[in-house]
Amino acid sequence: MIAVISPGFVLFAALLAGLWYACPPPRRWQLLLGANLLFYAVLCPAALPVLAGSSFLVWWCGRRTAKKPVFLAGLAAALLPLALLKYLPAALGWQGTLANALGIGYFTLQLVSYLCDVRRGRILPEEKYARLLCYASFFLSITQGPFNRYDALMPQLDRPTVWDTDRAWRGVQRSAWGYFKKLAVADRAAVVVDTVFANPAAFDRTQLLLGGVLFTVQLYADFSGYTDIVLGVGEVLGLHLPENFRQPFFADSVKDIWARWHISLSQWLRDYIYIPLGGSRCSKARKDGNLIITFLVSGLWHGAGLTYLVWGGLHGLCQAAENHLPPRRPGKLRHALRVAGTFCILAGAFVIFRASSLANAAELFKGILCNGGHAVFSNYWELGLTSLQEEILLYAGIAILLAVDAAHERGVSLRTKIAALPTPARWAIYEVCIFVFLFMGRFLGGGSFLYARY
């Protein structure tokens, strides 16, 4: 098994890195294509023909986009697998091997962006089908992103990048930080979140509040952890992939959230939905409508359920409302209040996102308002935790995560600072980090990455 969270992936990435630097640069894209197809074939073999077929149709249409009917046919070819394998099974209640195939939302949007960029003249159509397939199937981003633009990723594969020990070590550090987020924060938070959302009526308001907040933390640690892992592997290979997160819990508006959270999706929505609708160069009413439509599309991309559509609509409505607020007044206290308020909106919307249905979300919100008590401070076992130590480790992991984000928000690069220390001090820090990771990580019973389902 070579899922990103498995030891098999570490071995797979290490072997690929060795072959990568042994391979002549003009042939590296072919090596990567083989690695991509092997990776996807192991994880989701039934969907491999769908990926290959959709990529072929988009490649064929991309060479003929001067004709609008061909361009539209290419868009249909890119979007059809998403409609047939994600939305149709959800609408009809089908459960099968191909239902919601792994990574289908990611390679679909990448193929759409390629086709649109060719149509607009931003890039030249790819002559080789295999190279487009390499782009669409890129193993580091096919399951959870980040979204890559064709003109940003593919030229890197032809550059004569040589081995750089310092760069590779930075990549390993970043991947290790991603595994810490996943195993020490996300998977520990998942225990509480799954317990609370399964039966909201059984918990008091403090436990429900904790469950709602912890899901936001879980999703951030899980998703950004994955991003750190794959960006670290990319760094080892000498590939620069787009950043996907920038301290989202420090956002001071809903608009600012989307400049910090799932950044590559936000940019995709801006370039291929919002701007074609008219963007902000129109009347205020139409601008508001464009925002709402864009985020409804975002919700629909995440899933076919009403919970996703409502979640997306809420983000669109909040951004539209922010456009009509008076200018901000400066001040640290006002900024802190805006950050706190924005986090409440983010966490509240994510309750709907996580809920199994709108009724499940309503039950949880009702419990927050009506269920008295404060057992969150004592009865940890009710939340699925097996010991007080497990609860302490959860909060300690969150504290470390927030402390690192706070440093980054102030412009402090911890990796740079550590690298500048004398060798004994630097390695002492590395050893402490390894011990903390081994002590705090939840290595048994952890789940897959949350965003792999989208």
Which residues does each PLM region occupy?
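Membrane-embedded transmembrane alpha-helical bundles that form the catalytic cores
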Residues: M1-R453
